[in-house]
Amino acid sequence: MLMPKRVKYRKQQRGRMKGKATRGNFVAYGDFGIMALEPGWITSNQIEAARVAIARHIKRGGKVWIKIFPDKPVTRKPAETRMGSGKGSPEYWVAVVKPGRVMFEVGGVDKEVAKEALRLAIHKLPIKCKIVSRQDVEMGGEVNEGV
């Protein structure tokens, strides 16, 4: 499970997800990737489930890059606890994802295998995504044609 080794502050406010991704919005390492189409929080368990789905499908060929990291703690109070008496303790970690962000990349496998592996991974994620290739995405992050 992904999480930071140490953080300066244990608890964070929820924050807002405004606008599009300005960083990590193109396929940098592999040939194909998963691009987010809507904002959301991706938990470390969801990232791991998607990684396992990709790894199982591509078997020993190819390489997988995870381009997001869960660095935001989400707190939760115990069940049947009265309101008040402070903020709950950190329960799990999430990565904040904005539209246009490329979250996973796959390289070193043929087109059909890569697309099927990424399709399986998309089903593990809680937001709408699409499969993009290196040719589809310019350096600016704008998608020319849907794959």
Swiss-Prot record:
Q: Which domain of life does the UniProt lineage start with?
A: Bacteria
GO molecular function ontology, one term from the record: rRNA binding
Origin organism of this chain?
A: Caldicellulosiruptor saccharolyticus (strain ATCC 43494 / DSM 8903 / Tp8T 6331)
The entry's keywords: Ribonucleoprotein, Ribosomal protein, RNA-binding, rRNA-binding, tRNA-binding
Name-wise, this protein is Large ribosomal subunit protein uL16
An annotated GO cellular component of this protein is: cytosolic large ribosomal subunit
| GO BP term, example | translation
Membership in a protein family: Belongs to the universal ribosomal protein uL16 family.
Task: Cite the record's note on assembly.
Answer: Part of the 50S ribosomal subunit.
Biological role stated in the UniProt entry? Binds 23S rRNA and is also seen to make contacts with the A and possibly P site tRNAs.
Q: Identify the InterPro entries for this entry.
A: Ribosomal_uL16 (IPR047873), Ribosomal_uL16_bact-type (IPR000114), Ribosomal_uL16_CS (IPR020798), Ribosomal_uL16_dom (IPR016180), Ribosomal_uL16_sf (IPR036920)
